[in-house]
């Protein structure tokens, strides 16, 4: 199994269990998320509680709480952040480029520098529709993960900066 960690914080942000599609000249990865239900599941095993001596109205101590979560957010314990306005986002991108560029090597660094402007413009065009997430450590100087919904979709897509991820074999 491959896990993708944030190069800046070391937080696990993605794994190969979630296939990605390269967009914006490979600078961004798009990953499909899904809403899933977690918690107790009501299973009817065909038993008759009254025949077993149990009170039909009695709570048998089972917590029937179910929660809908997005699989990627839950799996990697992503933490949602407040939305950014254009000025805040541009400030974050500039700081991110400054922090990430020295960690990249040779061709990877050149590709990142060459294509980051287009990727930034792409994200700026969707800014009002994006949700922002960071990894579990919630550091200020880390990669952001962006989520949005395509028109008419019920499940979100997640967008990652590909160059900000380090592949680790587990």
From Swiss-Prot:
Cellular component GO terms held in the UniProt record: cytoplasm
Residue span, TCTP domain: 1-170
Record carries keyword Calcium: yes
Record family assignment: Belongs to the TCTP family.
GO molecular function: calcium ion binding
UniProt keyword list: Calcium, Cytoplasm
Organism in which the protein naturally occurs: Fragaria ananassa
Pfam families recorded: TCTP
Main location: cytoplasm
Matching InterPro entries: Mss4-like_sf, Mss4/transl-control_tumour, TCTP, Translation_control_tumour_CS, Translational_control_tumour_p
Protein name: Translationally-controlled tumor protein homolog
Record-linked PANTHER family: TRANSLATIONALLY CONTROLLED TUMOR PROTEIN-RELATED, TRANSLATIONALLY-CONTROLLED TUMOR PROTEIN
Subcellular location: Cytoplasm
Function according to Swiss-Prot or TrEMBL: Involved in calcium binding and microtubule stabilization.
